[in-house]
């Protein structure tokens, strides 16, 4: 072969290699990735401490190399190296692990948030839906609502309205009138402060509607209103406020009788609110004649069953304890006293826990001593049993010698 032929062959080989490089961009990316990973490997090896030796050093190098490889494999899509290995084969294992880790992290964060405050998540309570205060959103949380125990923290389910009326109809006065039956003391106080004339109107309306109230006779001879009885059951079902577990309620040594008595006297006024079961003609769909006929029939039934002395209904105004206003000195002192009481109860719990811990350690040490003494007694018993066997053999030998003295 001549020199000219060699030049032609070398030129054709160079052009073929260039065409191969242009036609195989995956190979070029693999070479570039290999060079970058090698450079990263060298820099990591130079930055390691000199005191790392043996397997720890190799393990750290492998971890760093895997980290850089995963970063290159899952880089931005513009780089053109997403999901490819050194050989150009797509790798889905690392991406699956990263997505799985992200899903696990989100699930763990959501579970921790639900454990901290489960009533703030509407996704879990939307299916149940029948509990009071179950659909509280994060956007509606305000400081006034949290401190005042207002809406939407006290929400009455619409199905609870059916148990208030005798005929199964919905209570026509709406949610605001039902808050005196179901709601908390703060809502009752707020309604009294906002509407000071509502009590007088309610009492006058009560005096006019006492004639149409259905009164049932109990076996003990006491009067009982059917609407009040059903409303008490409704109060028990829908009394779902935020009752947190405090150290005061868990402490076995804390004296909380005065506080509980005060709470009972405050909450007793909620059940004394009268309920009128007479409904307007538009709500029931009947005429005025039907209502008058129903009232006359109820009067006849009451007159035939109950004496006239027992038909007198005494209207008692609801007893509601007035709490101190917010951001005042009395309110602050009440909060300070409550905090002090909780601190004292927490210290009591800590002392009880320390006492139990000391008694547990003392019992453990005594148990160890008794086990050690038991082992010593077992060893001594085994030694005595061995000596007893030796003495038995010696007695047998001496008896044989006494029987045969010639030997």
Swiss-Prot record:
Q: Which domain of life is it from?
A: Eukaryota
Q: Where, subcellularly, is it found? A: Cytoplasm; Nucleus
A cellular component term from Gene Ontology for this protein is: cytoplasm
Q: What is its main location?
A: cytoplasm
Assigned keywords, A-Z: Cytoplasm, Nucleus
Give the coiled coil ranges: none
Task: Provide the function of this protein.
Answer: Involved in cation homeostasis and in the regulation of the cation stress signaling cascades.
Protein name in the entry: Protein ATC1/LIC4
Species this chain originates from: Eremothecium gossypii (strain ATCC 10895 / CBS 109.51 / FGSC 9923 / NRRL Y-1056)
Q: Which gene encodes it?
A: ATC1
């Amino acid at each position: 072969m001549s020199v000219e032929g060699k030049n032609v062959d070398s030129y054709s080989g160079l052009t073929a290699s260039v065409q191969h490089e242009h036609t195989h961009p995956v190979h070029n990316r693999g070479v570039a990735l290999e060079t970058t990973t090698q450079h990263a490997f060298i820099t990591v090896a130079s930055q390691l401490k000199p005191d790392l030796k043996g397997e720890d050093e190799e393990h750290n190098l492998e971890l760093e190399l895997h980290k850089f490889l995963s970063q290159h494999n899952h880089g931005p899509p513009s780089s053109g190296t997403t999901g490819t290995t050194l050989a150009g084969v797509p790798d889905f294992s690392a991406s699956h692990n990263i997505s799985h880790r992200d899903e696990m992290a989100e699930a763990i964060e959501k579970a921790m948030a639900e454990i901290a405050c489960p009533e703030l998540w509407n996704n879990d309570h939307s299916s149940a839906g029948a509990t009071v205060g179950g659909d509280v959103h994060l956007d509606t949380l305000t400081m006034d609502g949290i401190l005042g125990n207002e809406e939407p923290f006290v929400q009455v389910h619409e199905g609870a309205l059916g148990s208030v009326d005798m005929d199964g109809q919905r209570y026509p006065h709406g949610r605001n009138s039902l808050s005196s039956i179901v709601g908390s003391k703060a809502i009752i106080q707020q309604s009294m402060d906002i509407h000071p004339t509502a009590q007088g109107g309610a009492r006058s309306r009560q005096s006019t509607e006492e004639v149409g109230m259905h009164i049932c006779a109990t076996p003990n001879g006491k009067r009982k209103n059917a609407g009040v009885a059903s409303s008490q059951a409704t109060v028990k079902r829908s009394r779902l406020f935020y009752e947190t577990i405090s150290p005061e309620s868990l402490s076995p040594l804390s004296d909380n009788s005065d506080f509980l008595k005060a709470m009972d006297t405050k909450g007793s006024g909620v059940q004394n609110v009268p309920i009128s079961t007479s409904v307007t003609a538009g709500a029931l769909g009947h005429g005025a004649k039907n209502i008058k006929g129903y009232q006359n029939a109820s009067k006849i039934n009451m007159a035939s069953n109950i004496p006239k002395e027992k038909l007198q209904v005494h209207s008692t105004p609801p007893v509601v304890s007035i709490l101190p206003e917010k951001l005042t000195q009395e309110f602050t002192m009440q909060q300070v006293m409550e905090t002090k009481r909780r601190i004292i109860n927490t210290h009591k719990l800590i002392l009880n826990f320390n006492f139990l811990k000391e008694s547990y350690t003392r019992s453990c040490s005594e148990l160890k001593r008794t086990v050690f003494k038991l082992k010593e007694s077992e060893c001594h018993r085994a030694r005595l049993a061995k000596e007893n066997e030796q003495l038995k053999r010696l007695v047998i030998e001496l008896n044989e010698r006494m029987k045969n003295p010639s030997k």
